[in-house]
């Protein structure tokens, strides 16, 4: 039995030094809903956000299923190899709403080609892009 109703759901795993603080950010600032939350800040939390999940957990050393991998928060938040990208219908409205809730954007939304975008950081320094496609409604990339 699985908690996933579809064949596949894309989730994003976030390593946090303070799971409770991150849970509050992803629920109270970004508007997600905690669907699984541990009793203590050291336990995993799942936040439903848009049509996906954010999995928040503390870092840690290798385990038997990832024997060479150590999970940690970004040592330098300005050097990034991967980040969460949230697509929205109205970036100006999201920018205003999330700013009012305490999100600290790096810049206001800016036009870049066929999208407007801006960036925020979560409490552990992980980068999050917020973007709005400015292509015609219903446009999809070719398959």
Model regions and ranges:
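Short Gly/charged-rich anion-binding patches and loops
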Residues: 21-22, 93
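Vicinal oxygen chelate
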Residues: 1-11, 33-86, 93-121, 133-143
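Conserved beta-strand-loop-alpha-helix junction that forms the acyl-donor binding cleft
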Residues: 13-19
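Conserved active-site tyrosine of GNAT-family acetyltransferases
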Residues: 22-27, 98, 125
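Short, solvent-exposed loop/helix junctions and linker helices
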Residues: 16, 85-88
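Short glycine-/small-residue motifs
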Residues: 127-130
């Amino acid at each position: 039995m699985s908690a996933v109703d579809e064949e596949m759901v894309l989730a994003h795993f976030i390593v946090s030094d303070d799971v409770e603080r991150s849970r509050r950010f992803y629920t109270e600032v970004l508007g997600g809903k905690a669907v699984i939350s541990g009793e203590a800040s050291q336990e995993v939390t799942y936040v439903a956000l848009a049509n996906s999940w954010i999995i928040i957990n503390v870092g840690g050393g290798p385990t038997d299923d990832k024997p060479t991998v150590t999970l940690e928060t970004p040592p330098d938040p300005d050097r990034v190899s991967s980040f969460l990208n949230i697509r929205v219908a109205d970036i100006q409205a999201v920018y205003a709403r999330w700013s009012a809730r305490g999100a600290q954007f790096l810049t206001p939304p800016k036009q870049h080609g066929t999208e407007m975008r801006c960036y925020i950081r979560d409490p552990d320094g992980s980068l999050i892009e917020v973007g709005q496609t400015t292509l015609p409604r219903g446009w999809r990339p070719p398959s």
